[in-house]
From Swiss-Prot:
PANTHER family: ATP SYNTHASE DELTA CHAIN. It is a peripheral membrane protein. Belongs to the ATPase delta chain family. It comes from the Bacteria. Coiled coil: none annotated. Keywords: ATP synthesis, Cell inner membrane, Cell membrane, CF(1), Hydrogen ion transport, Ion transport, Membrane, Transport. It is found in: Cell inner membrane. InterPro entries: ATPase_OSCP/d_CS, ATPase_OSCP/dsu. The gene is atpH. Its main location: membrane. This is ATP synthase subunit delta. GO terms for cellular component: plasma membrane; proton-transporting ATP synthase complex. F(1)F(0) ATP synthase produces ATP from ADP in the presence of a proton or sodium gradient. F-type ATPases consist of two structural domains, F(1) containing the extramembraneous catalytic core and F(0) containing the membrane proton channel, linked together by a central stalk and a peripheral stalk. During catalysis, ATP synthesis in the catalytic domain of F(1) is coupled via a rotary mechanism of the central stalk subunits to proton translocation.
Length: 174
């Protein structure tokens, strides 16, 4: 339910401002990741409003936070801003891909992965690669883009072979 409510606020913010608040929203999210004072129930609303007034934020962003606080939903601010940024990226036909590999990828390899994903997903114009090193995959890559998972890892291939082997053995003995 909270995700739905936050999504409605994010859509409203995008309808009013379009993509022009994206950089300010990212900066404010960085600040909230260090100290999400808007979600603290023990901090008075008047104190939160005073802090918001002191921050150099666009008036639309301040008004959104004030509205959330007035409706006792200050804890949704981070979720709303993340939803807004997702809407902006979606309208620019941009996506984030999380790539896990055994070792760090070079810039050339990242570009090749992004280019291959652009071919696989022609409706996208840009793919941002976020890389994570994961030694448990033994080699290869796993790619997660939106809700799609592409497993090109050795560990994934071994698990698939093991599954096929087990099902074959079960068929033999039945």
């Amino acid at each position: 339910m909270q995700q739905y409510i936050a999504g409605r606020y994010a859509q409203s913010l995008y309808a009013v401002c379009g993509p022009r608040l994206e950089s300010d929203a990212n900066k404010f999210l960085g600040l909230l990741s260090e100290n999400n004072f808007l979600s603290f129930a023990k901090v008075k609303t008047s104190t939160k409003l005073h802090v918001l007034d002191r921050l150099h934020l666009p008036c639309e962003l301040k008004n959104l936070c004030k509205l959330l606080l007035a409706n006792h939903r200050g804890f949704l601010c981070t979720t709303v801003l993340l939803g807004y940024i997702e809407i902006v990226k979606k309208n620019r036909k941009e996506a984030d891909a999380r790539v896990e590999s055994y070792s760090r990828l070079s810039a050339t390899a990242k570009k090749e992965v992004a280019d291959a994903l652009l071919i696989k997903f022609p409706y996208l114009k840009k793919i941002n690669i976020a890389q994570k090193v994961n030694r448990s995959i033994l080699g290869g890559l796993t790619i997660k883009i939106n809700s799609i998972m592409i497993d090109l890892s050795i560990a994934g291939r071994l698990a698939k072979c093991k599954s096929i082997g087990q099902s074959t053995i079960l068929e033999i003995f039945q």
